[in-house]
Amino acid sequence: HRLDEATVNERVDGLLDALGLTESADTLVCDYSAGMTKKIGLACAIVADPAVLVLDEPLESVDPVSGQTIRSILRRFVAGGGTVIISSHVMELVESLCDSVAVIAQGHLHAIGTLDEVRQGKSLQDRFVELVGGNANTGEGLTWLRRS
């Protein structure tokens, strides 16, 4: 469905304000920092109020204050009936935002279910490493790192 110009302008103004980008509204996106670009990408994705948002690393390069704002916006979107699909390597982010989780590595699905089902009593970080067969190398051979 097509949105009328007044609705688009109202939503854009609200998103720019919420994301702290109002003063940069006339700046070319190519001149934005990585974090600002990430925020503008979210604003572009959400302005039409889609049923589903698919976000890749939504908090990467974003400062903590903006990150909290983005989390709040995403929670509000979900509370309003929307669905958010997040791809992230930051398990703490996944644990704080997601109800359901799929662990995918090298194109293979290793686990899917609610957060608790996938974690199986562990942190999601530990469970992810367990599921994908993480490297147990702790750098013990790097003896030159010691200052003794």
Task: Spell out what each predicted region is.
Residues L53-E57:
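Catalytic Walker B motif of ABC-type/P-loop ATPase nucleotide-binding domains
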Residues A6-S24:
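Conserved ABC ATPase "signature" region
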Residues Q68-G80:
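Helical segment within the ABC ATPase nucleotide-binding domain
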Residues I112-G113:
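ABC ATPase "signature
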